[in-house]
Each structure stands twice: as structure tokens, then as C-alpha cells.
């Protein structure tokens, strides 16, 4: 079977689709990756697949550019003669599915990992973009084989838009690499070495890892840090870009928080922390939360969709009110004060994370693909 993975970014395929790709290749399927050429082009070669770079202006709303990109993608897909296409993210899930239909690809799967900033932002521009995205999804619903969701909330939203029940499949999480993310005790010497390197005082570490977007709860994290800065080192890790929804560098350099930028050593930072925090406004099924849980860390997350599915309140973490920095600080404070509670939550978190091994998630995808192909052969 010839299987294509279509994405708007190389990072998405490299970090979140690799386990599925490896599972397909292990059983003899041919895999082709289709992405715009970006900084992950070289790293994707590690997956030993054919890589096709296609044209995509990610941020463009110009209809002429969008149409030109669409025709180019349709022609590329038609030339590949794929049996199955897996897409992810809004443009791939809509234009990709429609292009695949014109290219006569028989099996088309769309993955919704979250609705994104356009469904959080209240500006007039975002409202218009939402209308366009919703319209395109309604078209894609007719032609996709299945829509895969990482949480029930997003499935319910698309169901309300008109997606038929038989086309809905929920596979929670994209999976965690449990060979990389697992509990590993950190010695006092290691922790002190880290604190000294970054000129931090000898205090507990409260860590947040996310893109520096306002809707990830960056402001609430910084405000909570201001309230608790005498009690803990607050560390924020995450890259920023020119997106208007990103926090400014001036804001991020606030003295109450140690901003470390984008890092590749996140597993080491997670193991160093005492409390992991994600005060997001909306999530799909947060990978960083699951990675922190896999490393046996108690988490404080917002009581928003996506986060409440990844963390069970008072069992493997705590919920804080979305957008409420005071409540967030109180929940963090509770874990800083109660070491026994923190340890119990962390133990449960590690146990729960075992259910989301990326290899098990990959098996679920392959089973879904195979069932679709077999059903089609019987018709």
C-alpha cells in the first residue's frame, strides 16, 4: 500500500507521525511524506521515506495564491498514485482532502489535533477566518473516509457542523515516546548545577513548556510567577515568532520568570522540575502534559477542553480556572506546600501515561486504515 502523509510543517510529521510511519514501513508499506520545504527538511530524511516538497503559503489569505497552491497540490497527489492519504491541521484537512479527491485517492483520513487560535481569538478577522474554515470543513466532510480526533470536544464541534457519526473516530493523544520520557531521579548535584548555570536561587522549579502564544496561558503563568516568585523558580520554555498572538520578547524577559526560549533538552528540564504547568485556554490533547506525566510530574492545567481530558483533577494533577492567574497560583502553591500530595499525583500520572505509548497509538491508526481498505474491497 502506498501511503502519503500531508502536513503544513515538517515538524508535525517528524515529532507526531514518526511512530505511525515506522509501523507502516515495518510491515512493508511504502510511505511518502508531503510537506513544504522548511527547517525540518534534513531531519525528515531520518525516517527513510520519499519526501515531496509542495508549495504552501501558510499565512496567506489571498484567494489567487491559495488556488494556485491547491492546483499544485492536486497535481502532485495525482502523480503519486497513493492508496491512502493522512492529513493534519486545517489547510491539509480541507484543501488536502479536496485535492486528494480530485486526484482520485481512495482512502482519505483527516486528523484534528485541536481547533487552534482562530477558534479562541475574538477579533473580527478571526471570526471571518473561522467562517471560511468551517465552510471548507463542511465540503471535506463529504469526501473524507474518516476524521480522527484527539478529544471528544473537537469531535462534538465537528458533529455539530455536520460531520456524520460513521466518519468520526476518536484516538486520544498522538502518543508519547516512553523510551525517551520516563521517570528518572535527578540528584541534588545535578539540580544545583542547573540552577548555578542559569543563576537561579536554590528553590523548587515550576516549569511551563509551550509556544509563546497568549492563548497558551503565558500571561497567567507570568502573573502567577509574580505572586509566587519568592517561593519558586518559574521557568518558561518555548519559541516565539512574528505571529501577532505571540507574547513580545520584552514581556517574556520579565524578571519574575526565567525565559529560556526554544530548547531541545525538554526531557531534562521536565525531570528537573517540581511542578509542571500548562494554563492554556484550549488544547487538543497536549503532548507536553503527557510527556510531563510520563516523567512522573504532578501537573497543574486549565479546566479547558483538551486539558481536562489529559489530566484527572486531584488524581494525576490539578485543574485551575482557565484565565485565572490567582487560582493558578493557589493550585501551584498547594503542590509546593504538600510534598506527599505532589508525589501521589506524580505516581498516578506516570501510571496513566503508560496508556499512551506512541507504538500503541500507531497500532490503532494502522487498524483503522486496514478496516477502511477491507471495507472498500468488499463493496
What are these regions (language model features)?
Residues 298-302, 311:
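Short hydrophobic beta-strand element within catalytic cores of glycosyltransferases
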Residues 182-200, 364:
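A short helix/loop element that forms part of the nucleotide-sugar donor recognition site in Leloir-type
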Residues 313-314, 318-325, 334-339, 354:
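Conserved acidic donor-binding segment of nucleotide-sugar-dependent glycosyltransferases
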Residues 87-93, 112:
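Short His-centered aromatic/hydrophobic patch
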Residues 52, 138-186:
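Donor nucleotide-sugar binding/catalytic pocket of nucleotide-sugar-dependent glycosyltransferases
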Residues 262, 281:
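Aromatic "clamp/platform" in nucleotide-sugar-dependent glycosyltransferases that forms part
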Residues 35-39, 176, 209, 213, ...:
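Glycosyltransferase donor-sugar binding loop
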Residues 14-19, 204-227, 326:
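A conserved mid-protein helix/loop that constitutes part of the nucleotide-sugar donor-binding site
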